[in-house]
Amino acid sequence: MNGQSDYKGQRTAGMRGMSMDNILGDPFALATISIAMLAWFIAFIGSILATASHPPGDGFPNYSWFTIAYMLCCILGIFVVIASDTTQTYHVAIVGFLATGLVLTSSSVNSLIYSSNGAKEATAAGHILLSMVAIVWMFYFGSTPSAVPRAYLDSFALHKDHRVSSGRGMSTAYGNGYGHGYGNGRPDTSISSNVPPQMYTSAQLGGFETSSPVAGFPGGAAGAERNSSQPRFGASNLGPNGAMGSESTPGEVVQPTEYPYRAKAIYSYDANPDDANEISFAKHEILEVSDVSGRWWQAKKENGDTGIAPSNYLILL
């Protein structure tokens, strides 16, 4: 329920946050939309001149007018989607509409390109440009953000998160086998069956453990499952009265006191109320991280709160 409500909130916020900065700050979007509008005007003016120079029903295909109207709607729709930063919400629909538009523009080119009339040739040239832009858009919107060509184009955009291609990389940011993929929706924090969960000892999480049993958190052996979607940690080192035991072994790892890494939240996250180890954070919030080797990172917020956070909600800076 939290994931669904957060997704709806992000989508609504994206529509309310429509801004020209998303267009002007993205060279690819600015260039392709500008070329598409120029091509549309060429086709539109050429169609007017071609229709005026021929008697009604003679020479100029009527469906070319529908093509012009249809492509205008596609261009305006893409403009709105990019300006509202909801590309990953509507990218499938965009590809479908562009595929239909490519068929229409190609048919118009085939009907007009062989004419000796200059107005028809100009109209055909406009439709050719529209077809080329449609092909580029279909490749862009039909690719995942982790695709190398799209990631390269997105790297020039000012408003988009730039993800590194090595180390943790984009596969972690977009699920790494256990997320829902990509987009404005939050990824899932559940664990897939083909990757073992990350285990921690009580010494590693000494500062995160509670002084009393938490409801829904059975004290079984390490790896025991619980009803939550979060991974099960190692057995606690609690004493009989609920306090942390004083015994320590040479092999134990002390609680980290340094946080050498910085990470940015690419999604907001609400901590599980049944697990006091987790911390909540907002989208774009900066966290300090002590260890980036597992799925759950030990993090500290700017206000000093410490806890664990899912790695697929964060991106290293």
Swiss-Prot record:
Region (Disordered): 216-255
Membrane topology term: Multi-pass membrane protein
The keyword Cell division appears for this protein: no
Pfam families, sorted: SH3_1
PROSITE patterns: SH3
Stretches in topological domain Cytoplasmic: 1-27, 84-92, 143-317
Keywords tagged on the record: Cell membrane, Glycoprotein, Membrane, SH3 domain, Stress response, Transmembrane, Transmembrane helix
Entry's transmembrane regions: 28-48, 63-83, 93-113, 122-142
Recorded superkingdom: Eukaryota
Gene3D superfamilies: SH3 Domains
Subcellular location: Cell membrane
Example of a GO biological process term: regulation of actin filament polymerization
Sugar attachment sites: 62
Residue numbers on the Extracellular membrane side: 49-62, 114-121
GO cellular component: plasma membrane
Purpose of the protein: Plasma membrane osmosensor that activates the high osmolarity glycerol (HOG) MAPK signaling pathway in response to high osmolarity.
Family, as annotated: Belongs to the SHO1 family.
Quaternary structure, from the entry: Forms homooligomers.
Protein's name in the database: High osmolarity signaling protein sho1
Name of encoding gene: sho1
